[in-house]
Amino acid sequence: MKFRFPVVIIDEDFRSENSSGLGIRVLAKAIEVEGFEVLGVTSYGDLTSFAQQQSRASAFILSIDDEEIVEEKPEAIEQLRTFVNEIRYRNEEIPIFLHGETRTSRHIPNDVLRELHGFIHMNEDTPEFVARLIIREAKAYLDSLSPPFFKALTHYAADGSYSLHCPGHSGGVAFLKSPVGQMFHQFFGENMLRADVCNAVDELGQLLDHTGPVAASERNAARIYNCDHLYFVTNGTSTSNKIVWNSTVAPGDIVVVDRNCHKSVLHSIIMTGAIPVFLMPTRNHFGIIGPIPKAEFEWENIKKKIEANPFATDKNAKPRVLTITQSTYDGVLYNVEEIKEMLDGKIDTLHFDEAWLPHATFHDFYGDYHAIGADRPRCKKSMIFSTQSTHKLLAGLSQASQILVQDADSIQLDRDVFNEAYLMHTSTSPQYSIIASCDVAAAMMEAPGGTVLVEESIMEALDFRRAMRKVDEEWGADWWFKVWGPNDLSEEGIEEREAWMLKANERWHGFGNLAEGFNMLDPIKATIITPGLDVDGDFSDEFGIPAAIVTRYLAEHGVIVEKTGLYSFFIMFTIGITKGRWNTMVAALQQFKDDYDKNQPLWKVLPEFAAKFPRYERTGLKDLCAQIHGIYKHNDVARLTTEMYLSNMVPAMKPTDAFAKMAHREIDRVLIDELEGRITAVLLTPYPPGIPLLIPGEQFNAIIVNYLKFAREFNERFPGFETDVHGLVKQVMDGKAMYFVDCVAD
């Protein structure tokens, strides 16, 4: 397949009628005759912005005239040096040629010269020869870009082989036989459909057996991610977590789990028949889940939890796995080296669910606050696993995930045993585009480019925070939005890691007395706080702006956020973020403020929402905010939601046994008013925040029941802003919505 990567020529005379302009255009024409596109420009412009275009080029030709290489006029040399440095900051391999008249390499500073692939003298060799020289280097560069699996897949898709195997669309041909299929084909395109193949294509290797180009790509990714073993997973980190667990946990094993874990970890507990003991995180009244205090990780405290668990028959059994959410949804990180020091050898496997942290290993900013990195010491006895969603913050397609493994000094991964669990959870018909995106996402993070991508994400996140503070200073005398995070930020540049440490009893985070150096906040995760609630859980008597209304407004104005809480919403600065995106966010928030202050009617500012829910048509934006704020305040919802997550969850059955009751239909569908004391057979997960509240086998307490009653009343009063609780069963009886939970039968 031919990719579009033009040769970029930068020459101030490119469009001039002088001899220099004529010469460079003749060279450009010779390159085009050889089949390469040429992009000619007359100046560097914004050096940084232009250098970023290296990702779209196959080579650069930089022109410099004799009169510019003189000591009296160093500007041209300095501009050349700056541009070359900007290119090399991002890309060490792309060919750079210097095009001049009579001066030679001895006239060019050595720090510039050593970065060049060649020096082209005008009017010496023929343009045709020089063009072939440039194209040879450009082709070699382009050939080096594709990682193993992606290269094999593009070759296969371009090869023109007839497929007499599945999938049934046969390279997209089936879609051409139907009008709606034609639409599908035109939307997704020839390449994606030709590359959608099955494991019958031996030349692409096998994901399930880790052979051929697939294996080569996994080895390449392991090198890039600084781990001993790496496995691509095509159906998300939910599956990666289950693979890790099924490879090491059996029925009756004791496991130590972050209570703030993803539901896939709880599913793993149910599937394996494990006996969980939970480490309890902190939580502030904004609804932000904080870190697990360091004391919870102390071995003596873990032993006490095991001894207190009624289902742990062998109180001295060694836990098989520790699973920690790293980072939390809101960006709180743990110092992994301290956890390793505390628990090495005491727990067989230390598993870090890093679905939201695949970028950390590529920048020194994150230090020891991620699981596996370059020059990080091994555990002596415990294996380290990291499960990462490359689709969340890097460039993987949706569901692209990977498992990273670091061997211990005394224990190495048994790849054959591990692969049995991998086979259990991996489709025999994996999506090859996802495999390719895992491959490419890893290759993109190769230094120096990956480091630059992460640094740019951090810088954009910091610039967003600074912009929001600037608006607050200039325009927010009455009210404005806050960005959750440390108060003292510099005006320019990237912050030191120390600035993002969560220090004991600092009011901004609200997590209390935290251990020094144990936690930090990832700056690329930004939680915007709306007015009306403080970190202590006290509601404003004057006014409040619930976040659900703000994010509904943003959505109708083309800005979609990641997560919405009571008075906060969450956005991420991934490697795909742009200045245009976050500046549009700032502008949209300013427009919201203006519409709120004017109390604009919803039919005007939220027309789609008002059309769907006509009861709100004539309601003012400020009035609606006041109504929902009043309900939240009256029910003290911030404290209620905090207390229910921190309340005592009593295990009455093993999770596996309770779930089995549901599978056998040995359940009662219980009204929420009658839930107190009943044992749930299902996961109960309120959104926000999307963290499971109860797991099968635990009993409902009064606080949780009170929250469910509130959710029922709120949903009836404010349709369109419903509190979603997974695990609740809604049934309409006699025109009235009734809510139930499936519980273990009495």
PLM regions: where:
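A short, charged/proline- and glycine-enriched loop
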Residues: 1-7, 55, 227-228, 252, ...
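Conserved acidic segment of CheY-like receiver
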Residues: 3-31, 39-40, 60, 269
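Non-catalytic terminal extensions of PLP-dependent enzymes
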Residues: 32, 46, 51-59, 70-81, ...
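Conserved PLP-enzyme active-site core in the AAT-like
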Residues: 41-44, 48-53, 85, 109, ...
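Conserved acidic residues
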Residues: 56-59, 114-120, 128, 228, ...
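Hydrophobic/aromatic residues positioned on beta-strands within the core alpha/beta folds
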Residues: 98-99
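Conserved N-terminal alpha-helix of the aminotransferase class I/II PLP-enzyme fold
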Residues: 190-239, 741
